[in-house]
């Protein structure tokens, strides 16, 4: 009986819960759930940490872009091009601000001057002169010859002490050749296109 009891107790005592099919399945399922929950927590923490690091990097890059001042390169190129000297730039700005519309507003009034018998012409800025007398003196000095002109009061007036062999004429806006001095100086400046020093015997 003792052996039987001992033998009867031996199978029940030697039976392990791990070898039982139902208990083994339950233990495996619990272990799998624990592993899955651990993996999910790890994955969530990894994804959260990686996404937060990406967000921090993007915010740092945006802050760096905002801190760098944007330089309008195109506007600087257009503003500084063409490379001209400061005084020339200011002169061009003044000329553009002044605009046209008359001899008084213009800064320069260059006209071509030709002398009969001389193949090479000259250029003269009429706005640097203050009247017909200064124009005549300037042309006499340029061409080394005495020149006369017709003024408003008289047909011809010679320079005192000199015998003029040439007379000054000009081409107006209509293409007609006129005697210099027939109209007031301001009207002459608004209509003159070209000057010609002609011989007296041909006028």
Curated annotation (Swiss-Prot):
How is the subunit organization of this protein annotated in UniProt? Homodimers and heterodimers.
Low complexity composition-biased segments: 10-31
> InterPro entries given for it?
AUX/IAA_dom, AUX_IAA, PB1-like
Q: What are the alphabetically sorted keywords of the record? A: Auxin signaling pathway, Nucleus, Repressor, Transcription, Transcription regulation
- What processes in GO biological process is this protein linked to? auxin-activated signaling pathway; regulation of DNA-templated transcription
Primary role: Aux/IAA proteins are short-lived transcriptional factors that function as repressors of early auxin response genes at low auxin concentrations.
Family annotation (SUPFAM superfamilies): CAD & PB1 domains
Main location as per UniProt: nucleus
Residue spans making up a coiled coil are none
> Where does the record place it?
Nucleus
Domain annotation PB1: ranges: 108-202
Q: Which Pfam families match?
A: AUX_IAA
Q: Which family does it belong to?
A: Belongs to the Aux/IAA family.
What the record says about the induction of its expression is: By auxin.
User: Can you say what this protein is called?
Assistant: Auxin-responsive protein IAA4
Q: Where is this motif: EAR-like (transcriptional repression)?
A: 40-44
Segments for region (Disordered): 1-31
**What cellular component GO annotations does this protein have?**
nucleus
Q: Which residues form the signal peptide?
A: none
